[in-house]
Amino acid sequence: MSGTLLAFDFGTKSIGVAVGQRITGTARPLPAIKAQDGTPDWNLIERLLKEWQPDEIIVGLPLNMDGTEQPLTARARKFANRIHGRFGIEVKLHDERLSTVEARSGLFEQGGYRALNKGKVDSASAVIILESYFEQGY
């Protein structure tokens, strides 16, 4: 086991991506993947998996603030199931509440409004999701 994990922040137009190391508990953003109504470029995901060879994949689970599911929750679950089904890698879902808010705030502090492009926000959210997963001791 390499201790490498990939995280995805699922969205219908853009899917944020991050790579992290279990040993350091840190993650960094990778370029976001464009999606067509929630359908990603599966060839690109396959290339990412071959390049990084993760032990496990984390997919952000979008929930309402009260913990209830929202319309995007089922689509994120479906995305996670498809990754597992296509590639046979263990996939876990992780609560992503407030990750986008935190990502926007951090990017704005670094570069103002110009830093807030969709792909950067989505991949920064994936970093937050993965680091949160590490912080919870997984």
From Swiss-Prot:
It comes from the Bacteria. The lineage of its organism: Bacteria, Pseudomonadati, Pseudomonadota, Gammaproteobacteria, Enterobacterales. PANTHER family: POLYNUCLEOTIDYL TRANSFERASE, RIBONUCLEASE H-LIKE SUPERFAMILY PROTEIN (PTHR33317:SF4). Belongs to the YqgF nuclease family. One of its GO terms (cellular component) is cytosol. Could be a nuclease involved in processing of the 5'-end of pre-16S rRNA. GO terms for biological process: rRNA 5'-end processing. Its EC number is 3.1.-.-. Disulfide bonds: none annotated. Its main location: cytoplasm. Keywords: Cytoplasm, Hydrolase, Nuclease, Ribosome biogenesis. GO terms for molecular function: nuclease activity. It holds the Pfam family RuvX. NCBIfam families: RNAse_H_YqgF. This is Putative pre-16S rRNA nuclease. It is found in: Cytoplasm.
